[in-house]
């Protein structure tokens, strides 16, 4: 761990199409091997698919709703106490909530069966906005783990 203190939070430039920092972060998390243009095509393609399927729904609002639904409130962290390792439930800070939600949505989308990544991502976002899908299962599993280990909450640091 660094002894130089906390580094300032780096800001992300808003995405060019919608002017949203959340979408820009989402694009950066979809990106693999530095291929940002491919990631932009995937995310914008997914938003187009969402707009086609739900003409009444705004794609940015749906993405935000999906992220809010998937974001975990608590998670477990390992803590060693006297030779035993305990899974200690801790609250998740807001920046980590969004990062975990994005990561889980993208991972769940990659595992889906649709034929193109924009369709996979759109389907996962729609499911998450309606409280179903793989990312929601992951959040429920995390909450269950925290609930099961509630007895060790006094080991928090």
UniProtKB/Swiss-Prot annotation:
Domain of life from the UniProt record: Bacteria
Entry keyword set: Ribonucleoprotein, Ribosomal protein, RNA-binding, rRNA-binding, tRNA-binding
Gene Ontology BP annotations: translation
CDD domains given in the database record: uS7_Bacteria
PROSITE patterns per UniProt: RIBOSOMAL_S7 (PS00052)
InterPro entries: Ribosomal_uS7, Ribosomal_uS7_bac/org-type, Ribosomal_uS7_CS, Ribosomal_uS7_dom, Ribosomal_uS7_dom_sf
Annotated GO CC locations: small ribosomal subunit
Pfam families in alphabetical order: Ribosomal_S7
GO molecular function, one term: structural constituent of ribosome
Family: Belongs to the universal ribosomal protein uS7 family.
Role, per record: One of the primary rRNA binding proteins, it binds directly to 16S rRNA where it nucleates assembly of the head domain of the 30S subunit. Is located at the subunit interface close to the decoding center, probably blocks exit of the E-site tRNA.
Quaternary assembly: Part of the 30S ribosomal subunit. Contacts proteins S9 and S11.
PANTHER family: RIBOSOMAL PROTEIN S7
Name assigned to this protein: Small ribosomal subunit protein uS7
Source organism (scientific name): Stenotrophomonas maltophilia (strain K279a)
């Amino acid at each position: 761990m660094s002894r130089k203190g906390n580094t300032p939070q780096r800001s992300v430039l808003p995405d060019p199409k919608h002017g949203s920092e959340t979408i820009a972060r989402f694009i950066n998390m979809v990106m693999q091997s530095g291929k940002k243009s491919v990631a932009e095509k995937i995310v914008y393609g997914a938003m187009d698919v969402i707009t086609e399927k739900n003409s009444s729904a705004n794609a940015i609002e749906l993405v935000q709703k999906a992220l809010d639904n998937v974001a975990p409130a608590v998670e477990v962290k390992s803590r060693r106490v006297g030779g035993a390792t305990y899974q200690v439930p801790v609250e998740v800070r807001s920046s980590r909530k969004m990062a975990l939600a994005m990561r889980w949505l993208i991972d769940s989308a990659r595992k889906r069966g649709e034929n193109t990544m924009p369709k996979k991502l759109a389907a996962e976002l729609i499911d998450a906005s309606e409280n179903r899908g793989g990312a929601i299962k992951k959040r429920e599993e995390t909450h269950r783990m925290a609930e099961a280990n509630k007895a060790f909450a006094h080991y928090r640091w």
